[in-house]
Amino acid sequence: MLLNAPVTDSEVQNPEPDYPNVSINDLLAMVRLDQSKGEVLLTEKILLAMDNINDQVLLLKIDTETQIRKYKRAVCYEAAALICEDNLDFDTTTNGQSRGENQQAKMQSLRRIVNHTIADLTNRKRNRVKLI
């Protein structure tokens, strides 16, 4: 059995002062992650996720508790998707390929939740499509 050392709960300062901060405990409570990644990596992924989400909600004023919850949810799921991308690996065996495919499906599911949460936050419809 592998036991992870507890990760201290540090709050990650949002680069955008008008938007809420997100802590490591927020991330671990919101999405299914283990603590084996460590405080430094989790903090970095939260910060990268904040940058990604902040770019998508420019000029949006986040005031209410509902908006704060939705913002934190978007950041946490984006951070989880970034971690999932880092863990994506392929090898030449059948098991490695199926693990990689499962990770891709998980990553797409996490990003879908992010997109739905941002749509809810910005009062847009969820069924957006990208034109090629």
Question: Where are the language model's segments positioned?
Answer:
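Structural motif
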Residues: T64-A74
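Short loop/turn elements at secondary-structure junctions
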Residues: Y77-I132
